Swiss-Prot record:
It comes from the Eukaryota. InterPro entries: Mpv17_PMP22. GO terms for molecular function: channel activity. One of its GO terms (cellular component) is mitochondrial inner membrane. Coiled coil: none annotated. This is Mitochondrial inner membrane protein Mpv17. It is a multi-pass membrane protein. It comes from Caenorhabditis elegans.
Length: 181
């Protein structure tokens, strides 16, 4: 209970930094679970660090800004407004966001921009298609019931499982990844 009160206070006073910390923690935990489920012999702490860094320094700030921009979309009919926001989110933001995540993740794996682009082209469609089976439902709940400062957190809670999937898909063996130690 003390942790929840602390988080609520932090969200009220410093929403972005709080969401960044929570996102990095949840994302790193999701990667740890993905590594465990894939029976990795040894925990790859740098892989977990990459996921945590990307989530806290790119994903959380992007979502923080995105949800505030999405709030500016207005309409008289609540149902139509929800559909409008959902379409903007899933058809405009989500494809670009997924592409940026995949590209940046590969760069953090020390891939060249060219190799990162090639891998993005290889993985993007399947990941985006799968995301359409998950995220529209999450966003309906988010947009209808969740206060603005908590939306990134709800996304990150669901992203715990989504990141397990992303981690599994994007961590397939790649020719010559240099380990960053």
């Amino acid at each position: 209970m003390v942790i929840i009160l602390f988080i609520r206070r932090r969200l009220a006073t410093n929403p972005l930094s709080t969401q960044m910390c929570i996102a990095g923690t949840i994302s790193g935990s999701g990667d740890c679970l993905a590594q465990y489920l894939s029976h990795n012999q040894e925990w790859d702490r740098w892989r977990t660090a990459r996921f945590s860094f990307l989530s806290s320094c790119f994903m959380a700030p992007s979502l923080f800004i995105w949800f505030r921009l999405l709030e500016k979309v207005k309409g008289n009919n609540k149902s139509l407004l929800l559909v409008k926001k959902l379409c903007i989110d899933q058809l405009c933001f989500s494809p670009c966001f997924n592409a940026a995540i995949l590209f940046n993740l590969r760069l953090l794996q020390h891939q060249s921009a060219e190799k990162s682009w090639d891998l993005l082209k290889e993985d993007w469609f399947n990941i985006y298609a799968t995301s359409l089976k998950v995220w529209p439902f999450v966003q309906v709940v988010n947009l209808c019931f969740v206060p603005l400062n908590y939306r990134v957190i709800l996304n990150q809670v669901v992203a715990f499982f989504w990141n397990c999937y992303l981690s599994y898909i994007t961590q397939k063996p790649i020719d010559h990844i240099e380990q960053f130690y």
